[in-house]
Amino acid sequence: MSARAAAAKSTAMEETAIWEQHTVTLHRAPGFGFGIAISGGRDNPHFQSGETSIVISDVLKGGPAEGQLQENDRVAMVNGVSMDNVEHAFAVQQLRKSGKNAKITIRRKKKVQIPVSHPDPEPVSDNEDDSYDEEVHDPRAGRGALANRRSEKSWARDRSASRERSLSPRSDRRSVASSQPAKPTKVTLVKSRKNEEYGLRLASHIFVKEISQDSLAARDGNIQEGDVVLKINGTVTENMSLTDAKTLIERSKGKLKMVVQRDERATLLNVPDLSDSIHSANASERDDISEIQSLASDHSGRSHDRPPRRSQSRSPDQRSEPSDHSTQSPQQPSNGSLRSREEERMSKPGAISTPVKHVDDHPPKAVEEVTVEKNEKQTPTLPEPKPVYAQVGQPDVDLPVSPSDGALPNSAHEDGILRPSMKLVKFRKGDSVGLRLAGGNDVGIFVAGVLEDSPAAKEGLEEGDQILRVNNVDFTNIIREEAVLFLLDLPKGEEVTILAQKKKDVYRRIVESDVGDSFYIRTHFEYEKESPYGLSFNKGEVFRVVDTLYNGKLGSWLAIRIGKNHKEVERGIIPNKNRAEQLASVQYTLPKTAGGDRADFWRFRGLRSSKRNLRKSREDLSAQPVQTKFPAYERVVLREAGFLRPVTIFGPIADVAREKLAREEPDIYQIAKSEPRDAGTDHRSSGIIRLHTIKQIIDQDKHALLDVTPNAVDRLNYAQWYPIVVFLNPDSKQGVKTMRMRLCPESRKSARKLYERSHKLRKNNHHLFTTTINLNSMNDGWYGALKEAIQQQQNQLVWVSEGKADGATSDDLDLHDDRLSYLSAPGSEYSMYSTDSRHTSDYEDTDTEGGAYTDQELDETLNDEVGTPPESAITRSSEPVREDSSGMHHENQTYPPYSPQAQPQAIHRIDSPGLKPASQQKAEASSPVPYLSPETTPASSASAVNHNVSVTNVSLEEPAPAPPTSHASQPGCLGAPSAEAAHVVLRGEGPPLPPHADPAKVYRKEPYSEEMMRQNHILKQPALGHPGQRPDKEPNLAYEPQLPYIEKQASRDLEQPSYRYEVSSYTDQFSRNYDHRLRFEDRIPTYEDQWSYYDDKQPYQPRPFENQHPRDLDSRQHPEEASERGYFQRFEEPAPLSYDSRTRYEQLPRTSTLRHEEQPAPAYEVHNRYRPEAQPYSSTGPKSSEPKQYFDQYPRSYEQVPPPGFTSKTGHYEPLHGAAVVPPLIPSSQQKPEVLPSATKPQPPPPTLTEEEEDPAMKPQSVLTRVKMFENKRSASLENKKDVNDTASFKPPEVASKPPGASLAGPKPVPQSQFSEHDKTLYRLPEPQKPQVKPPEDIVRSNHYDPEEDEEYYRKQLSYFDRRSFESKPSAHLPAGHHSEPAKPVHSQSQPNFSSYSSKGKPETDAVDRSFSEKRYDPAQATPPPPPLPSQYSQPAPPLSSSSLHIHSKGAQGEGNSVSLDFQNSYMSKPDPPPSQSKPATFRPPTREDPPQTFYPQKSFPDKAPVNGAEQTQKTITPVYNRFTPKPYTSSARPFERKFESPKFNHNLLPSETVHKPELSSKTPTSPKTLMKAHSSTQPPEFDSGVETFSVHTDKPKYQMNNISTMPKAVPVSPSAVEEDEDEDGHTVVATARGIFNSNGGVLSSIETGVSIIIPQGAIPEGIEQEIYFKVCRDNSILPPLDKEKGETLLSPLVMCGPHGLKFLKPVELRLPHCDPKTWQNKCLPGDPNYLVGANCVSVLIDHF
């Protein structure tokens, strides 16, 4: 093209860039400020170029700067103050201090036309010319899409030089050329020896920053410092990141060819020398660098930018936030780069809209250039692919992008841009368009597959083509879901015109990097996850959506939660926009009528006489805040507030705070005066604050202090005023009284009212708070903290709507009569009208009625209206409260002290209501409030706490309220089970805490539980999502919180002996261990809510184990429900552990204790969990009698001790469990018979299959989704397991695990579980029964093996969802130590382990099954799945499902012995005691094995089947395998096997794997049921080996054999190796992943740790299925002390890969998360090609293990 271009440009002018300086005077305008946003600064250099200039990142339309300033202008001076090399905050302050007018001097890059002087250089290289042209037009052109988006305009990244860089390369060349078009100089450096360096250091512009003395470049003499590098080895450097350029140079293989442009004016050399040349850190942090589309740098960069950028986290958004507000919100994830690119596309001439436009922009360019430009445009999309975050705390689903990807992008970029092959395809749509799509708004929409013989295929569309336009609809910035829906909506027979461009390389990188969509949303409703991989959330949470077509299906989005400091915290599934709108609408309408009879009773009980109208009006008003104008998902971007944001203060002393600020800081704060709504109206009745009033105050450069309702705050946010909302969190009612007496003695406001209303406010509107300050009544330190918080919030970036508000908000803010809203109640601190006598009286008189909660009743309606009706409605101590746990937790983050307390309290509270008298409840409610307040508003603390509490102790209790969509059921739960509710509340209150437990401890525990719950919730969230099952699942979740406990169990157990019987101690330990997670508690509450929701029926479930026993049994709420749920929940809770193997492990013990206390509960729980049928049983009498049959011995034994242990936690009570377990174990054989009955139920397991089937659906998905699909499968399998576990399998396991026998049986049952999800469910049930059989011996044994396996598995499970697994792991180790404890501890551990194992097995089985056999038997499973759901064990099990051990709750409950895991397969017989004995060999401890053996054969066989599921067979091995198993979910080869058709993987992989995978699954526990059974039936010993996993050593070999059986040539994996690693000396295994791969390759990844191994196609010889695993370890002996509070982290984790001795035909890529400080920006160009450090990950190529 250079020749062509030269010809075309022979008479044309070359476009080059120069810098112009302009000085403008801006006048501050109300509502706009100066109308600009700035980014950059010394502390926030451009992520790519390192430029530290202050850059105009956004110019508001209609603002004062419009037409005067432009985006990407560099700010040179403000009011005469130089802005060179200053910090961002300094620049912002200068603008703020400038008053009404600001004189701003800017430097602007201007393109000028200069006679083209390329011809000479052009001959040098056509590419060269092209690249030059490209660069010339690139500024706006297609590559501009990249460049534009990413750096060219530096839209968001303007602040960085990277933009400049991208522009610079062209612009600099041009600038040089502008004066005199200098010819590009071609330089070729040839190394004389391999280790010789080129001696170049490239800066952000891709220009020569410096030349080393005596280097090749210096000796050559043709390169000078400041030369702009146009091409590297034929690849155009325009829009290329430094990382990509570095990669290109590293790949030069000793010969480096470069085309450079002499920069006579040394413009580039004068660019501020930041860390711009540090491609590694900067590249990662500066998206611009990744412009070239280096996925590695781009992804990492963005991810780093996003969270890490400055404390204000300005950087992530700053780049992108201002300009691509609306368009880039999706791209925002890419941080500025996406936005900048997108905006550039949009704002730049047709950058996004049409590649051709770019051509127009650069007329001089040749047509080919135009194509290139188009390519560039598309390419920009490519850079967008943000690989996964590999950050330590983020369990990202996305695969870490390998640094090497960067080079690919370059080539792709080069090819696409230089030789874009655009095609216009026209055809008529048939039944379908015949296309599968990959990509997304972040990278572009690509064709991932074309249906053979379809019109599209005939017209030449092929995989890897980027779709630029369809029927004149621009596809360059559209999310994948919208693209798919658009194509689906096209009428049949309509002509379809597609403009596409061939970009195979880019597509391949996208698929391999698993990138596509990327935009930010803020939620405006509450959601409880429906699957293990789901994410629960409250209102006001921010997510980055990375895949809008998760699993290749409509309905779910893959999103990453954005936590504190805008860091990405965890990823999972959320409903898509359409579903979210439906859920939100239901949530907003339900509250008004939600509650049912019971809720109505509570709501209206206190509405007597004069209060009725008042309360009704208040209810009406409270509905308003809920009726937000925001959509369910609001697209947001991070931006700076260009004005002084209004300040709203909530809390018991808000009135004092406002007056104090306005009085002492009149130059900064001014109270916005309210006006009567209408002239002549009683001012007190209602008033409004005019928006005009606020604007006037802002125009005076002051913060407007607003006394408004939460509804008004929501409207302010909608109007994009984004007030700073500070919540002053009271410490106690007495504290409020003390403070008000001190601060405003004349005030007549009721301290109690203020306190309660504060808690309600926090519970229902916590999402509105921008910061929370914990009040200490002993001092006035809150005032300084308040001022500091306001200043900090003002300086921070704000998540703002991408677009303008749909309609202008009303011109005023309703102050809302105090009566109308507790927030604005005149009597409350929130209302400016404190004179309303009615309110004052209301404050006073409610004391008598409902106690402290009468008010809450009033607020109930408010809450309901707000969208959390259950919570508010259930504020009474005696009535179940819905906890806005997540919300509260968010607040908890704000107030750490509270969150620990709050959660535990919630737990206590749940129990306490049922247990304590109303008065006591009230008192307790008050006392717990402080605890609650952290979690939730004190007023709603009962509910909120309940949720939290329910998580740890009775998380099930609150479940009902939690689910927003289950309001109807919730009310029933809440209302009908009043006893339950009461129990919940009681528990929430302090009293539920065991006498031994200390509240603090409990609280801590709780938070942790919640957190764990969240994780578990993710894992466990029922995949099925049936309402009925959901509650059961929820209970699982409730138990889940214990997962964390389990993880920490060892340590906890060690400490817990004293609290063994105290839940509080349990929580306390948790708290300590997991405090760091508290910040995630926001989410946890959500989980808790889910629990509540699930536990809807089980409010009594207050599982304050002992205390709750009676409550659980309380039939008054729902005798059946209560017992079922409560008990079931207990057991169910363990089920969730199955997902979080550790959690479950601990939880099981706890549940065991609890359950044992409530003997019926265990049996019931099993049933309930499995299905409604069970519930009837529970409700009947079996509740106590039937469950007892199975669990009675067990529970009774427990009951004696359990009450204490119960509260403490089952894990602690392992001894108790052990005792209980013994009896169940004995009946194991008997139980088997029961299993047979349940065997009929096995069908329920098929639902799991259904989910698995879904995985195949993923198959059609593009390669892009491969990783996602992999995750999906993993999550699906987890979900299925969860469903099975939660509803059936999981729950039964919990039951099993709970009973001591279960733990004993655990090993065997666990394998069974692993066999298949269906089987697992069955086995799970048997587990509980088993416990009956075996006495302490088994318990000890279980404990013995449990600790290792459990912790391993636990870690794995947890790791899936959360980094928390890391912390959990230590706990898990502790449990290992703990198991050495008396039989009790052992038992509890073993039991948990069992459940854990089961849970593990399930997840793993599912994971493996799904990953390996999912496809294989997915279809088979698909058919059976639906029916199985109804069965007790809703959890589907693969083949086993038919023979799966469905342990009927009845049977389990009624016939303690009868509970037998009966696999219809030979496994069924296996369960017989003799088999168990034979298994004893398999199991480490024969004793333990014996009772379990019965269960074990069944379970072990299934477990055995899946390689990853081996864990389920044996706890010990399980841990190791478990880790792998979870990884298989996360990392099994399945993604590729599945239905991925990415170029990277073989599409056929799935089918072949379908065939082999089942075997593998059997080998790996994938096809635990059928395959495993086939194997085990033929070779029971193998299953035994699987079970042997329990006995780490023996089992491992067998397991190994099992794996090997399917792949004779494959290198066997030594189970012992895997297992030992877990407890390796000096190493703590944080996570494991394992999977079976064939010649098609695949990706093995660990979501929680971000570690992944990418096996290319052909790396494994044909015909061999090789199991591969890796363990992510923490080397405690080597690690230096890290100060995590200061952000010190390991740059990369320690990873051990296996099996050792395995050699690959092609190198496999090991990607490790890499968190490199932004300050370490320098990277040496020369380096090992097999080792590449990216922004977020390190990529290592290895050819053998």
UniProtKB/Swiss-Prot annotation:
Residues 149-175, 299-308, 879-892, 998-1014, 1106-1124, 1268-1285, 1335-1346, 1401-1418, 1535-1544 have a biased composition (Basic and acidic residues). Belongs to the MAGUK family. The 244-aa domain between residues 633 and 876 is the primary occludin (Ocln)-binding site and is required for stable association with the tight junction. Its main location: membrane. Residues 102-189, 296-364, 825-944, 956-1042, 1090-1586 are annotated as: Disordered. Gene3D superfamilies: 2.30.42.10, 2.60.220.30, P-loop containing nucleotide triphosphate hydrolases, SH3 Domains. The keyword DNA-binding does not apply. Residues 633-876 are annotated as: Occludin (OCLN)-binding region. Residues 123-136 have a biased composition (Acidic residues). It comes from the Eukaryota. The keyword Disulfide bond does not apply. This is Tight junction protein 1.
